A protein has these predicted regions:
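Non-transmembrane functional regions of envelope-associated proteins
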Residues: 1-141
Length: 143
């Protein structure tokens, strides 16, 4: 659990966006709604919805997680079916569910470790049963 309320992020983001940065990236997972401070989530979500240059991290989870039909994820998840995409493809994604999906601009922060378990490279995109999911850095290339 992240210790700061979303009001901290919202309070940081408002003046930062006033400076017109090309992009702001949160490499933090906003996957759980704050049940104690829902107004903080709402404020943060409103700022994200109004800004087209704020990007959030997401993660493909391992096989132990309960998989969901990829086609059922919101469009904001950024999954793109390729020519070999299976209609019944499933995967488990940790998405920023604390934020309305209409405000999502996200990318995967997964990496594939080397045989010794150390991550020395970064996945440009994830291939999930014929579906492509862009990494967070790749998502930023288009700005």
């Amino acid at each position: 659990k992240w210790p700061w309320p979303r009001s901290v992020h919202a309070g940081l983001l408002e003046p930062l966006l006033a400076e017109k940065p090309r992009a702001v990236v949160f490499d933090i997972f906003f996957s759980d709604k704050d049940i104690l401070r829902p107004d903080d989530d709402a404020w943060f979500g409103e700022i994200l919805a109004a800004a087209s240059n704020v990007y959030l991290a997401a993660l493909q989870l391992g096989d132990a997680a309960v998989p969901t039909l990829l086609a059922s994820y919101p469009a904001g998840a950024g999954l793109e079916p390729g020519p070999a995409a299976r209609a019944d493809a499933r995967g488990s994604l940790l998405l920023p569910f604390a934020i309305p999906a209409t405000a999502w601009r996200i990318g995967s922060v997964n990496f594939t470790p080397d045989p010794d378990g150390i991550g020395r490279g970064y996945d440009v995109y994830r291939e999930i049963q014929g579906w492509r999911w862009s990494s967070l850095p790749l998502s930023l290339i288009h700005i």
